[in-house]
Amino acid sequence: MSGVIYYKFKSQKDPSRITFDGTIGMSVFDVKREIIMQKKLGNGLDFDLLLYNANSNEEYDDDTFIIPRSTSVIVRRVPAQKSGKGTAARYVSGAPKTTGARSDSVKRPVPMLQKKAPITSGESNINKSPSSSEDAAIQQMFQVSSDQWRETQDKMASATPIYKPNQRRIAASVPDKPPPPGYICYRCGQKGHWIQACPTNADPNYDGKPRVKRTTGIPRSFLKNVERPAEGDAANIMINAEGDYVVVQPDVASWETYQSRKAALTANDVYKMQPPNISLACTLCKKLARNACRTPCCDKLFCEECIQTALLDSDFECPNCHRKDVLLDTLNPDYQKQREIEAVVKSVLGSNSKNSDKVGTSDDNNTPMSEKRKREDDDANGPNKFAARSSAVFSKATAEPAFKSAMAIPDMPSMPHVQGFPAPFPPFMMPGLPQMPPMMMNAIAGQVYHNNRNPPRTNSRPSNASVPPPSSLHKNPPTKTN
């Protein structure tokens, strides 16, 4: 009659079974051996195999203990306390341990390094406990490792370092000629010696940080030559390609240009100022009216943008007299006020003494496009409209021939006449054309020769000429020409 023992690992969901012949049970040694064989756990040198009762969680530490049939056990695989000394190896080899209890195997001799450190009472209790758990064994292993590493660190801290220059590398060969005038040792930042013969190569206290900053990417106009700095004042000192000590100086010209542009007034700045005459101010923003226009209801002066925004926000209601249905297309531009405001802006810009030569450029760049279009419309519709139109026509008339002459395709160069070939035929070796095959050249030459010997027949006979006899007509019929 056969019996069954059920087992499963801690992370396993469904239990597995071991079938054996007998009615009593199976020894712990045989159960562990069957588990290793079924699960293919290897030779068992790197782990220990533990069995626990599934109901009471009691460990089966005696290999000779008989586990009754139909018993469920929990299997745990823990790391070996020493590498390659796992206790599961004896179950694979088939050599049982006759001493019995596994608790003796837990009480292994403490390593020599561990004996030097005092053992706490908690650790001694864990070792002396007959039912030591898996966590206690792992904790003991970690404690031994940490003690060994701590002792190693203490030895390393008290040891004296031995400096051996060029221990792992071969000394570089020093050139036999003196360094060039602009050569710099980029190890110490000094001149007069090669980097292979630098005095700091044999210095054990040298940190190895480079003492030289290169001027890569910095224009020469931004560099200024200085004297050789002291040992501790070389923070901002660099060395150029010629070996001279330089420092970076600021771009004074660009900074002055920026400051002058910032100090110069623009048209936008003038429009934001308080107007010198209240009649030129906008009714809403109280500033110079930009693109001045008037409302048809109360005839007040507004900026074009201010009045349009106010009408759109108030459902086309005048902000001054509160009249309804004031549409945008009913606003009347005041060209007279626009010219007066432009004169005020120009006078303020002209009175600015700083960078007066750059004021016109900044004014034109900052002038809105609507104002530029309005100026063009005023010039075209003003008293000088005929002069403006004539100048525009003149500029267009002078620009078109120049454009056409620039875009004209150059004429084909005259080709020399080749004997035996028609005049418009290009030469054979003309640049840009492929070379003509010899057979084609012979065919063209033969055709020209045939045409010269036998010119085409034409109807040059006079009107009163006699008709040729029928025999001649039959032999050589005349060709019809149009």
UniProtKB/Swiss-Prot annotation:
SMART domains: DWNN, ZnF_C2HC
Keywords assigned: Metal-binding, Nucleus, Zinc, Zinc-finger
SUPFAM superfamilies hit by this protein: Retrovirus zinc finger-like domains (SSF57756), RING/U-box (SSF57850)
Region spans: Disordered: 86-108, 346-393, 447-482
Record flagged with keyword Ligase: no
Domain of life: Eukaryota
Name of this chain's protein: Uncharacterized RING finger protein P8B7.15c
Organism for this UniProt entry: Schizosaccharomyces pombe (strain 972 / ATCC 24843) (Fission yeast)
